[in-house]
Amino acid sequence: MASADKGLEEIQEGQIESNYDETVDSFDTMNLKPELLRGVYAYGFERPSAIQQRAIMPVIKGHDVIAQAQSGTGKTATFSISVLQKLDPNVKQCQALILAPTRELAQQIQKVVVAIGDFMNVECHACIGGTSVRDDMKALQDGPQVVVGTPGRVHDMIQRRFLKTDSMKMFVLDEADEMLSRGFTEQIYDIFQLLPQSTQVVLLSATMPQDVLEVTTKFMRDPVRILVKKAELTLEGIKQFYIAVEKEDWKLDTLSDLYETVTITQAVIFCNTRRKVDWLTDKLTARDFTVSAMHGDMDQGQRDLIMKEFRSGSSRVLIATDLLARGIDVQQVSLVINYDLPANRENYIHRIGRGGRFGRKGVAINFVTADDVRMMREIEQFYSTQIEEMPMNVADLI
């Protein structure tokens, strides 16, 4: 058992200690099945992120793995790629079970598995509360190789024998801290008892409270531990600048001037409100700039279309609220402009991380009025980073 193991002594830190530091910095050298590799690149990944470089290989090799990482680090793709590599598409039975704390996250994971596994002929079913039990039963009888779901519904389906566990090789717990804090502990323990003894366990968690550590000691064998720290993740390779703007009204002219100076391959401009997004889109369009806009008032179909145009490069500048900042990988973004500084520090990393995400370089420019200076200092402190005044030669950096 892992309890005597050194990393778990640091419990009060709430942080595990890595015991594994091998990295693989290209998807090509991971020995992935050709049809999986094709799916990885088709999905838009170019280089593995910090967690993907460390965690994919030990999972593929069959180790139990604990990975401590925040959201927005590419962790969903980490276990999706590993699961797809290990399962046998010809066996029409559930081989991997993935648990998530919320229905939304479970559906998001399902989309990623389906997208990356696009060329592999595998089925992935989302087993979540709030949907028809009958539909679940029917889908599970077809034997999807991957089932992703919330603990309550998954537990129910296993107990009713619709979700069969005999062929399960892998059990993934995503956002384990969230699941346990939401009171799913009992169901999770029950599910563990119902899986084959030899099942490989992969646990991902942003924090490592006592209850998560207990799960790791009880149910994991000699786990590989991987800690991906916040700063290492997202601000690496990203140059951050600010432009002092005397008052709010002058931001628009500042943005127009910036357009003149810089050739933008692709940029995202963040505003704090939907109204501001629409206003800025109108103003820039009136000045003959081509921009597209996206926020939460739009329906999913509209948003998908806008993202598709942006991904393909037919639209070059996207103006958005924080809705976009989480979980969307746009590989070619070279520039992120915070027209408004985010209202909370956590969103800063989600916005900026876009620019240099997954090993790409990027530039972030923050428009800062006198009212924003305190927030900017807080952001610098929180991420132990520096945001410097934008130099004249900024065009050379993008």
Swiss-Prot record:
A motif (DEAD box) lies at residues 174-177. It is an enzyme of class 3 (hydrolase). It comes from the Eukaryota. GO terms for biological process: cytoplasmic translational initiation. Residues 56-226 form the Helicase ATP-binding domain. Its EC number is 3.6.4.13. It is found in: Cytoplasm. Transmembrane segments: none annotated. GO terms for molecular function: ATP binding; ATP hydrolysis activity; RNA binding; RNA helicase activity; translation initiation factor activity. Residues 237-398 form the Helicase C-terminal domain. The keyword Cytoplasm applies. Component of the eIF4F complex, which composition varies with external and internal environmental conditions. It is composed of at least eIF4A, eIF4E and eIF4G. The Q motif is unique to and characteristic of the DEAD box family of RNA helicases and controls ATP binding and hydrolysis. This is ATP-dependent RNA helicase eIF4A.
